[in-house]
């Protein structure tokens, strides 16, 4: 069933989470049991680095690296912050937004058939942007070779921004497919280009810690979005 009494979760939503959880756990365990990691001693033989290079003082070393972030990483951090702020907002608010704006539901309606239709359509258009992302990702290397990584990412983010803005002008559910094409182009680049740009600007022996720090610019904007967006809306 795709509807439920007020205060309850429809069965189709429950099963979506069950299936998604099983697939996620399967992917984690597959990676865990099939990926071979090399010990530091073996890696040091091939890189010419000593193990002392990789030693630090734990948390204090991480804060020191955070303070000494390369300039390119600081610049990309701001781009990541606003990209993921927008994405988290989209994931949370797309269903109620199109339910009200496209399907004509009341603001406080979250249990009618029309709201359920909006929720189901959100799942479809989210599938569209992920499909577009998978296809567009195949062309990213060629585009980046032609115009550069920075310009590639800028163009892709522009497409995503226009896609999100176009939702406001959507007069029918099918129009939202066009919106999600733009989002899909941005999504492909967000998952690849920042890391490609970052990899060339950080020391090889600091790759792990800086990639971890870089992920702060993914999690923190989502936390901020979750805290402030509800009162704003």
Describe each model-derived feature in a short phrase:
Residues 119, 202-214:
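Loop-to-transmembrane helix entry/capping segments in MFS-fold secondary transporters
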Residues 175-189:
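Hydrophobic core of transmembrane alpha-helices in multi-pass small-molecule transporters
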Residues 189-203:
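Intracellular juxtamembrane helix-capping segments at the cytosolic ends
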Residues 130-138, 223:
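Residue-level signature of mid-helix packing/kink "hotspots" within the transmembrane helices
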